[in-house]
Every structure is written in C-alpha cells, then in structure tokens.
C-alpha cells in the first residue's frame, strides 16, 4: 500500500491534484509499485475531462495524456497486463501523478499539446522540429507600410501571411513582392533619414516613398495589390498590371510600360515556379505519413490563397509501437499549438478522434476547421504528391541513418569507445582580439544535428583574459559540466556526451583535462582536432588527453565526418559572435539614461537623426521630440551635460 510522504494537494482554482508515493523502492522501475501509485490517484479522481501527467521519482514528466473522463482513463493504466510494453515501462517508472481538470475534452486536448511541447516527455510522440515557422509581415503602423520576414510572437501591428515552410520560401516570396509591387523593406529609422533613393530603387525593387518618388495614395494601391496577391487573388492583380501596361504602351510611355512588364513577369515567374499547384483550394495544409524500418516521416505542404508556400518533412520521435493514426493526431495537435490552423487540413489517414481534433483546432482558430481524407479530384492528387514526398524523404533518411550508424561504429573504434556515440558535443571559441568573445557548443547524434541542444557561452568571468583561448575553453567547460553535474548527476537524461571534440590542439586539450580533473570527471572521452600549419582541411592532427597524437588519411570517411562536425561548430560560433558584435555596435549611450527604453530611444533617434545631434540639443529642443516628456528630456539633457 502506498502511503504519501506529503499531504495530497488539491487546488480548486487550478483544479490540480497531485499524489506522491512514499519513496520506498527507490528510483528503480517497479511495475507493481507504479500501478499502486496510479490506483491511489484513481480513488480521488472525478469523472470529468482533463489532463494527467505521469512523474518519475525525480519529478520529471514521463507522459502527458488527456481524457474525456479522467477516472476511467487513468484506471486503464492499473490493468498492466493489457498495456503494451511501452506503457508498462512508463507505469513501472511512475511515482506520482498530476491532474488538471478542464471544462471540455477539446480544452483538455489543447492543454495536452501545450504541456507536451513544454515538457517533451519520453513516452509521448514528439514533434522534433518545433522551430517557429516564418511568416511575411505587412506592417501597417506607418503611412508607407513595409514588408518583412517575421518569426516568433505577433506583437507588431500588421497583417501576417503564412506559415511558410522555410526561410527560403519566405525569401523567394519577398523577392517577388519587391519586384512586383515595389514595397519598401527598410526600417523606419532608415526610411526617416533618407535624402536620396537607395540601391533598391535603382534596381527596381522599391518605389522610394522615403524621398517622395511615389504618392501616399499610389503606394496604398501597391499595398492593396500585394495583399490581393498574398491572399490568393493573383489573377486580378495580373489583369490590372496587364491593362496598365497596355495603357502605358498606347500612350507611348514605353519606359513605364517596361516597368509594368517586368513587374508582371516577376509575378508570373513566382506562380510558374511552384512545384505544387493547388488551384481553387484556398487555405489548406496537406499531410501524409510514411513508415519503414522503425522510423516515420510526415510530409507537409502549406497552401495559402491557392498558392504553395513550401513543403517540409517531419520525423516525430518516440513512435515505436504507437499506432500511425495516433501519431498523426499527436503530430497535428503539436504542430498547430504554435501555428494558426487553416480552414482545411488534408491527411492521408484519419487521425484518432478526428472530430474532437477538428473541434479543438476550431477553438484556437475562432472558426470551423475541417479535417478530410480526400478520395478523388485535385485534393487527392495533391495528397498523393505528399505521400510520394513522405516516402522519398523517409528512404533518404534511412539511407543517411545507415551511413551514420557505420560512421558511429568507426568513430567508436578510432577513439576506443565502448559503443557508437549517441551524443557528440563539439566546442569552438570565437572573438576578434578578445572582443565579443564567446564559446559555442554544437551537438550531433545518430540522426544528425541536434540543433535544439546547441549552446553559446558568453565569456564573462573577470579572470578570463580577453583573447586567451585556453582560459576561454576552461570557462566554457567549467560552466557546461558543473551545471550537468548539478542537474543530472546520474546521467539519466541523455544530456551528457559520449564523446567531446574540441577545435584546438594540445593547449585546449590540457585546459579541458584540468577542468575535468577539478570536477572529478574521469570517464568522458575528449579529443582535440587541430588543422595543419596552413589551416587546410585534410591535414588535421588529433590530440588525446594522454599525450598521444595522430593523423588520418585524407580520404578517410571518419575524417570527413569529423571535419563536418568541426565546421558546424565553427559556423555556429562565428554566427553567434557576429550577432553579439552587431548587438554591441547597435548599442547607444542613450541605453544608460534612466527612464529611456526602446520606444523613447527610437523616438529621439528618429527626431534628431543621430546620437551626436541629441547630445548637442538644448533642453527645449529635446522637449519637442514626440513622446518625450519634460522629465525625460531633463534626464537626457543632464546625462549629456552633467555640469549643467
């Protein structure tokens, strides 16, 4: 019998119930013990909709599920003989549960998707690629709206178009928008400080509203045409451009006719370049699933306004032993947790609880959402193409996995590892004469780059001398592995590496060896990888902590693989360094003035043009800037004129 070691808690406001075991039996999996923990929860559960979380002895979330009737659903986990092996393993690790009641099953489904995304439990199907999708933002908070790429929260005022499958899809569409509709893409501060047109005007990618080369009314017409194009009314736009070109030619205005011709060609090109055509489909997403060799791929097309905005393939994790209809349902809920659902979702198989899924997605969209398995017509042809894509992408993935597995075995042989490494961490430093210094860590596994695990380390300790690569490496490793020891001392979360590669030679290896000795880590393999004297790839020398060093033949497959790993670390480090340097260069003395935030800083810069002009302004001039109060003006004036 389980005796809770702390009082059971029930918070009526949050409708959350938690029960914990008494700690007997330790952390070792125990099926009977886990089932008893669940029974102790069931006795107090309501027959209401809600979400449940299975927790292990450390309090980590093992699984998140939803239920129409919590008592009935959770009871099923106590009948362990009927559970598949995957769920038996989960129950054996369960030492506590958390329950959240909801007002409806649809609400429970939405909450389940949020919690899966937050906790990423090991027994849930997981959408690996949860990076936010790019959108096109048409900003409307200016007299002359601008177009730009956007990711993340929708805080800016304007119209959002998307999702696009990739940054490349957005770039191509933005390029077409600039060529066809001549909309500006510059920042407001750049716009406000122009005295002559920029290069984009010269190459016919902008109408130069910054210097009054187009009226506000005519620019509004361009914006309206761009909106029509993005919302699928491109035929009407083509017709208007064609008619305008004809009128210009009839009026002998051949220069204007040529401009309109080029705009029409740009619009026609972007339409003709689409490999997937979805005439008459409006807004829809198309998903198809392929399974083979223990892996699974879901291919998706994104259609908006009848136009293909790209495709992407997904490889969900933790799918072994999970029915494909359940995988599809879980995928859709997680995918749309961060992306607005369209009116129509086409799938190659009906997901579990399809009607409930459509209801939940409809609640997030504020309108009806249809989930359909088409059997004929254009929709079926489009779905068949997605099915082919899913199969081809999965075959490619399996071939890469086979090659990757072979490389893993050879890597284990080369560095005398017990098993092929499941997690490889690669480290590099980046700085320019000690400025904007940082360390970077990239991670690779059997299935490729683990970009969600990448980390950058801003060098910030006073004792780390700028430009001292060895000291930088010491700081990076001290911070990385001191935290690992604190957060995962038993190494059970899969966040400890099986192999560490360091971009550097003897000095870097010695620095890392000293850190590991200080932290009491004596079982973690690490290797230094240094290029030859001329820095050419192919002449790398490998340095081991015991002092040995060796090279590999230039045509060795493992050498090529290690070069790719090191180059990815270098790419990530350089990119992070450039971003840090750009941020530092973008800082201003105004950042140090009390009461000056981004909005007032922007207002002052737009009004005066430069920080030098702000510094030389009188108190009266400062007070004339929009949005700047007398108190703020006084603070700015006092900052630049400390003696009065």
Curated annotation (Swiss-Prot):
Please report the stretch or stretches of sequence annotated as the GIY-YIG domain.
47-125
Family in the record: Belongs to the UvrC family.
Q: What is this protein called?
A: UvrABC system protein C
Say where the protein is mainly found.
cytoplasm
Alphabetized PROSITE patterns for the sequence: GIY_YIG, UVR, UVRC
Q: Does the keyword rRNA-binding apply?
A: no
Species: Sphingopyxis alaskensis (strain DSM 13593 / LMG 18877 / RB2256) (Sphingomonas alaskensis)
Q: Where in the cell is it found?
A: Cytoplasm
The role this protein plays is: The UvrABC repair system catalyzes the recognition and processing of DNA lesions. UvrC both incises the 5' and 3' sides of the lesion. The N-terminal half is responsible for the 3' incision and the C-terminal half is responsible for the 5' incision.
Q: Domain named UVR: which ranges?
A: 235-270
* Single GO BP term: nucleotide-excision repair
Q: How does it assemble?
A: Interacts with UvrB in an incision complex.
Fetch the PANTHER family from UniProt.
UVRABC SYSTEM PROTEIN C, UVRC/OXIDOREDUCTASE
Classification via NCBIfam families:
PRK00558.1-5 (NF001824), uvrC (TIGR00194)
For this protein, the record's SUPFAM superfamilies field holds: C-terminal UvrC-binding domain of UvrB, GIY-YIG endonuclease, RuvA domain 2-like
Concerning HAMAP family, the annotation shows: UvrC (MF_00203)
Q: Name one GO molecular function term.
A: DNA binding
Which cellular component, as a GO term, is one annotated location? excinuclease repair complex
Question: What does the record give as the organism's lineage?
Answer: Bacteria, Pseudomonadati, Pseudomonadota, Alphaproteobacteria, Sphingomonadales
Keyword tags: Cytoplasm, DNA damage, DNA excision, DNA repair, Excision nuclease, SOS response
């Amino acid at each position: 019998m389980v005796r809770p070691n702390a009082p059971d808690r029930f918070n009526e406001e949050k409708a959350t119930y938690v029960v914990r075991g008494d700690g007997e039996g330790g952390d070792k999996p125990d099926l009977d013990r886990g089932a008893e923990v669940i029974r102790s929860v069931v006795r107090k559960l309501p027959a209401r909709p809600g979400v449940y979380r299975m927790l292990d002895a450390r309090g980590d979330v093992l699984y998140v599920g939803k239920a129409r009737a919590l008592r009935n659903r959770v009871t099923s986990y106590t009948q362990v003989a009927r559970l598949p092996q995957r769920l038996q393993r989960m129950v054996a690790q369960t030492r506590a549960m958390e329950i959240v009641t909801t007002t409806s099953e649809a609400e429970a489904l939405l909450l389940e998707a949020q919690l899966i995304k937050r906790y990423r439990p090991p027994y849930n199907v997981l959408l690996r690629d949860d990076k936010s999708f790019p959108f096109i933002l048409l900003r409307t908070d200016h007299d002359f709206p601008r177009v730009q790429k956007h990711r993340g929260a929708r805080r800016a005022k304007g119209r959002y178009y998307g999702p696009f499958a990739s940054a490349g899809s957005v770039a191509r569409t933005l390029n077409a928008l600039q060529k066809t509709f001549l909309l500006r893409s510059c920042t407001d501060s750049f716009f406000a400080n122009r005295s002559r047109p920029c290069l984009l005007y010269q190459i016919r990618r902008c109408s130069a509203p910054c210097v009054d080369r187009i009226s506000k009314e005519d620019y509004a017409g361009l914006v309206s045409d761009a909106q029509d194009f993005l919302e699928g009314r491109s035929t009407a736009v083509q017709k208007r451009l064609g008619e305008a070109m004809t009128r210009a030619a009839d009026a002998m205005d051949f220069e204007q006719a040529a401009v309109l011709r080029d705009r029409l060609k740009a619009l026609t090109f972007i339409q003709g370049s689409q490999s997937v055509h979805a005439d008459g489909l409006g807004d829809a997403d198309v998903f198809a699933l392929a399974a083979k060799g223990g892996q699974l791929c879901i291919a998706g097309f994104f259609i908006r306004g009848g136009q293909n905005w790209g495709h992407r393939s997904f490889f969900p994790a933790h799918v072994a032993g999970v029915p494909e209809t359940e995988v599809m349902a879980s995928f859709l809920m997680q995918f749309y947790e961060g992306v607005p659902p369209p009116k129509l979702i086409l799938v190659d198989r009906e997901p579990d609880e399809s009607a409930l899924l459509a209801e939940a997605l409809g609640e997030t969209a504020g309108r009806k959402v249809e989930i359909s398995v088409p059997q004929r017509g254009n929709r079926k042809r489009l779905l068949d193409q997605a099915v082919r894509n899913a199969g081809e992408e999965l075959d490619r993935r399996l071939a890469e996995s086979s090659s990757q597995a072979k490389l893993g075995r050879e890597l284990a042989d080369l560095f005398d590892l017990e098993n092929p490494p499941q997690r490889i961490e690669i480290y590099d430093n980046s700085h320019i004469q000690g400025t904007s210094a940082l360390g970077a860590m990239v991670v690779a596994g059997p299935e490729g780059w683990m970009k969600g695990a990448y980390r950058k380390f801003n060098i910030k300790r006073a004792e780390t001398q700028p430009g001292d690569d060895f000291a930088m490496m010491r700081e990076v490793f001290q911070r990385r592995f001191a935290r690992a020891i604190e957060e995962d001392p038993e190494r059970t979360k899969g966040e400890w590496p099986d192999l560490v590669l360091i971009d550097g030679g003897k000095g870097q290896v010695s620095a890392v060896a000293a850190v590991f000795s200080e932290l009491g880590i004596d079982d973690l393999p690490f290797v230094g990888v240094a290029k030859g004297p001329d820095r050419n790839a192919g002449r790398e020398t490998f340095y081991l902590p015991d002092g040995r060093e060796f090279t590999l033949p230039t045509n060795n497959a493992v050498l090529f693989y290690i070069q790719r790993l090191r180059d990815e670390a270098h790419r990530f480090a350089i990119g992070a360094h450039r971003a840090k340097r750009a941020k530092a260069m973008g800082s201003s003395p105004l950042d140090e003035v009390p009461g000056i935030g981004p909005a007032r800083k922007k207002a002052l810069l737009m009004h005066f043009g430069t920080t030098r002009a702000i510094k030389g302004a009188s108190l009266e001039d400062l007070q004339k800037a929009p949005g700047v109060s007398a108190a703020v003006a006084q603070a700015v004036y006092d900052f630049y004129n400390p003696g009065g």
